[in-house]
Design a protein with these regions (language model features):
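Loop/turn elements at helix/coil->beta-strand transitions in domains of secreted/extracellular proteins
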Residues: 19-23, 53-56, 82-87, 123-128, ...
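A short, glycine/acidic-enriched catalytic loop
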Residues: 94-123
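Cell-envelope and extracellular/periplasmic
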Residues: 18-34, 172-179
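Functional beta-strand-loop-alpha-helix junction segments that form "active/interaction loops"
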Residues: 34, 45-85
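Sec-dependent N-terminal signal peptides
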Residues: 3-13
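Active-site-proximal beta-strand/loop segments in catalytic clefts of secreted hydrolases
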Residues: 26-30, 60-63, 90-94, 107-108, ...
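Disordered regulatory segments flanking catalytic cores
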Residues: 9, 16-24, 36, 208-321
Length: 321
């Protein structure tokens, strides 16, 4: 009994640690000292944001020796596959594309899109994959899956020049001024929209031809959507596939640094809320196909289910302000 009591605090600590979000930042082969400084700075910004988020942060590729690809494989192998907490994988560096093969350049063997897809295939937890490298577009289709958010710095494999999206995104992800809907937290969608627009502005102000056009995919079709297809937080172009929600909805549910109110929800409550928000979006998209009575009846049901998350005692009392 005494042993159990002594061990209990350690068990609680371990369980708490397992419930943290995870952020894995991979810095690639820089090529030049200047690029190396950029990638290191961006990684430090992700580290600072992760600290604010109270997330577990790990960086791969910082050491000049070793095999960073194998290090990443081992880290992912140890990650929980079904945690309710999100896993963020961020690639900062250069990429290459030859034929049909896209790679992320590392000090040592390069990382192929198919390899990363294989390592992540059994993950059922919330998952964000951001490839800020040149020629990164093929990673989008290779890594697409239901419930995932995949971002690439380019819209094609032939956009081979150094990409600046990574720097703007590293800044925006921890920037409260990127909170476009003013809900007290910056979502991945908001950070990406700001970063993509700042990237485009850079080329325009410098009088250069833009050599990178970022894509975001979170509906699993692997096609991706550009930032200029959005008006505010809404996509202006609908998917050609019947019943498929537009990109952006899932990305808007990911917040690396959650607000005070968001932190009051458990991971399970957030997962339930997120599922209901997506169901609400699907239902609204079917409005013209339903009778008014049927539409509003189901709409009320969804909203009631959402309200129970914030007001579980049904008495109007909640920790959410």
């Amino acid at each position: 009994m005494r042993v159990a009591l002594i061990l209990l605090p350690f068990v609680v600590v371990l369980l708490g640690a397992a419930e943290k979000p995870s952020v894995i930042v991979v810095t690639g082969a820089p090529g030049t000292e200047e690029y190396g400084q950029d990638f290191a700075k961006w990684a430090d910004q992700w580290k600072a944001a992760s600290k604010k988020a109270k997330a577990t942060f790990r960086q791969v590729g910082k050491a000049k020796k070793g095999d960073p690809k194998d290090d990443l494989r081992k880290i992912l192998a140890k990650e929980s596959k079904k945690s309710p907490q999100p896993l963020w994988v961020v690639l900062l560096g250069h990429g290459t594309y030859a034929g049909k093969q896209a790679k992320f350049n590392l000090n040592g063997p390069d990382l192929e899109a198919g390899e990363l897809a294989e390592w992540l295939k059994d993950f059922e937890r919330p998952l964000v994959i951001v490839n800020c490298a040149s020629s990164s577009s093929p990673f989008l289709n290779a890594l697409r899956a239901k419930g995932r958010v995949v971002i690439t710095a380019t819209r094609s494999g032939v956009e081979r020049n150094y990409c600046r999206l990574g720097g703007f995104l590293a800044t925006a992800i921890g920037d409260s001024t990127a909170d476009l809907d003013k809900d007290g937290q910056t979502s991945l969608l908001e950070a990406w929209l700001i970063a993509a627009r700042r990237t485009a502005a850079f080329y325009e102000e410098e009088g250069r031809l833009a050599t990178e056009h970022s894509l975001l995919d979170d509906n699993g079709d692997g096609k991706g959507t550009q930032s200029d297809w959005f008006r505010g937080l809404q996509v202006t172009k609908k998917s050609a596939e019947e019943g498929l929600l537009p990109d952006g909805l899932r990305a808007h549910q990911f917040h690396l640094i959650p607000s005070a109110n968001e932190r009051k929800l458990t991971a399970e409550q957030r997962a339930e809320r997120d599922a209901l928000e997506l169901e609400l979006a699907r239902h609204r998209s079917r409005k013209t196909k339903l009778k008014d009575e049927e539409y509003y009846e189901r709409l009320e049901e969804i909203l009631r289910e959402m309200s129970r998350i914030y007001f579980p005692d049904n008495q109007g009392n909640s920790n959410i302000e």
